[in-house]
Amino acid sequence: MILKKLKISTWSGDATNCYIVFDEETKETMVIDPAGDVDKIIEIIDILKGNVKYIYLTHCHGDHIGGVTELKEKKGGKIIIHRNDAEGLNDVNINLTHIIDMPEIHLEADSRIDDGDKLHLGNLEFNVIHTPGHTCGSSCLYCDTEKLLFSGDTLFRGTWGRTDLPTSNFRDIIDSITNKLMSLPDETIVYPGHGKSTMIKEEKPIYLELRKKDY
């Protein structure tokens, strides 16, 4: 497996992490949260000689989906998102493109996934983990063989995603992290939607403390 990370400047003013996952044997490629800078994304895909199979969206916010339409038009791939966020792709009041000074986005998902679904990329298997909180349909992707997690805006290094936005909920995000993500192996590397990577073992003390306080 080859993993590439791009920090993409967005209209929200906060760089979004876009990830390109490439299976070397089959050349199947997955792009996670193509927020923009599509030419840069395509440049990497072309260098790898990759074939885009999936465009995976961890949630529906504009700063994660800004490059989806152009990427799909140029490289193909199925647009995948959790079913609870699928409608938000086509609703500017939920994807927030009307308030973060970017062109309005209206998208349709090719596939609406659920908790426990699996995606196969060549020899790699990814488990879908529904993690409501930042949005009602936020999801993470976990690969057990590689011990890596793409956490979107659910889990960050030292903190969690915002819960003051449409369909977000503070208790839900804490429950998602505490009861689902913190049960993953300690050595799991976490690749978030913004900021630096971390590991599950580095984040556990925060959520153990929150559990004690009965959040």
Language-model features: where?
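Conserved beta-strand hairpin/beta-sheet module of binuclear metal-dependent hydrolase folds
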Residues: 1-48, 140-152
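Residue-level detector of conserved, well-ordered beta-strand and adjacent loop positions
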Residues: 7, 22, 114, 120, ...
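Short catalytic-loop micro-motif centered on adjacent basic/acidic residues
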Residues: 30-32, 54-56, 128-130
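Short, glycine/acidic-enriched loop or turn micro-motifs at the edges of active sites
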Residues: 25-26, 36, 62, 85, ...
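Short Pro/Gly-enriched beta-strand edge/turn motifs at strand-loop
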Residues: 1-5, 97-101, 122-124
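Metallo-beta-lactamase
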Residues: 94-98, 125-215
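Active-site HxH/HxHxD metal-binding segment of metal-dependent hydrolases
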Residues: 36-120, 205-209
